[in-house]
Regions:
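Active-site neighborhoods and metal-handling regions in enzymes and metal-associated proteins
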Residues: 1-270
Length: 270
């Protein structure tokens, strides 16, 4: 019997049946196996309509991010004081005008970019000014019941020349991202089965080989569905060991990052 159970709790997202129920079923002489791949198959595959809507929203999101960076540039050059929260709310309005409810993007600068779960508040947000390193993590979906999310992260620098520490870190993070994506493309082309943890291993090895493994503080990616973090396979051999298979027509992020005391760099693609 396949149940929402994961041996040794390897994948806690799908391990939802309590231990007592497992014991009762086993006492009936029934073998229990994980329903992980079934959940992945039924919940993670996108329809063609979902894929089209996702791509359209992604284009709108890219336009909103470009507009946000232009908003920052205009205000900084005009010596107008703006904060992370101001940029966030500007983006929310841009998306509303496009008919998309995007919630509140994570707009962070400098030391706040080192917190992967940061979210600006109206009171106490940091100022965005010349010399700021900016990170924008942005989630949105079409206004339809079955629409799936798009989820991206961009980084930028407010100034004419980007300091070397940001360039160096960006190149490492980008290299890890591209290595993970290329691993998947090559494996699919060769007809190989890919498991979520393998994608994480590729990105993590790339970063570790360059001496920064201790600063990569989260999994490489997560499933995307009607929830921002869906129930399908995650690119994870760090927070959990996700041994589920990547399936055609499913969506997920690839988002390695490096986080230091004074700044963090993450790139996120779908």
């Amino acid at each position: 019997v396949a149940m929402e159970y994961s041996p040794m709790g390897n994948i806690p997202y799908i391990s939802r049946v309590d231990a007592g129920t497992i014991e009762i079923v086993r006492e009936c002489g029934v073998e229990i196996v994980s329903s992980g791949d079934l959940v992945n198959s039924f919940e993670a595959r996108w329809t063609e309509e979902q894929r089209r809507d996702n791509f359209e929203v992604a284009k709108i999101m890219r336009g909103a991010v470009d507009s946000a960076f232009a908003f920052v540039k205009e205000n900084v050059l005009s010596h107008n004081r703006i904060t992370e929260y101001d940029v966030q709310q500007y983006m929310v309005q841009v998306m509303k005008r496009a008919g998309i409810n995007a919630g509140g993007p994570n707009v962070s600068v400098d030391a706040n970019t080192a917190n992967p779960h940061y979210g600006p508040r109206k009171e106490g947000s940091a100022e965005v000014k010349e010399g700021s390193f900016v990170l924008i993590d942005f989630v949105a979906r079409a206004d339809k019941p079955n629409a799936v999310y798009s989820d991206f992260t961009w980084v930028g620098y407010v100034g004419a020349s980007v300091p070397e520490k940001y360039v160096k870190t960006w190149n490492i993070v980008k290299g890890a991202r591209d290595a993970a994506v290329e691993f998947m493309r090559t494996s699919f082309a060769e007809g190989k089965t890919i498991h979520g943890y393998e994608v994480d291993d590729v990105a993590r090895k790339y970063i570790t080989d360059r001496g920064y493994g201790d600063y990569f503080l989260h999994r490489t990616g997560h499933n995307i569905g009607r929830e921002g973090h869906g129930n399908g396979v995650h690119m994870d051999d760090f927070e959990s060991h996700d041994d589920r298979r990547l399936l055609p027509a499913s969506g997920f992020t690839v988002e390695p990052g490096l986080y230091f005391e004074t700044f963090g760099v993450r790139t996120e693609v779908n």
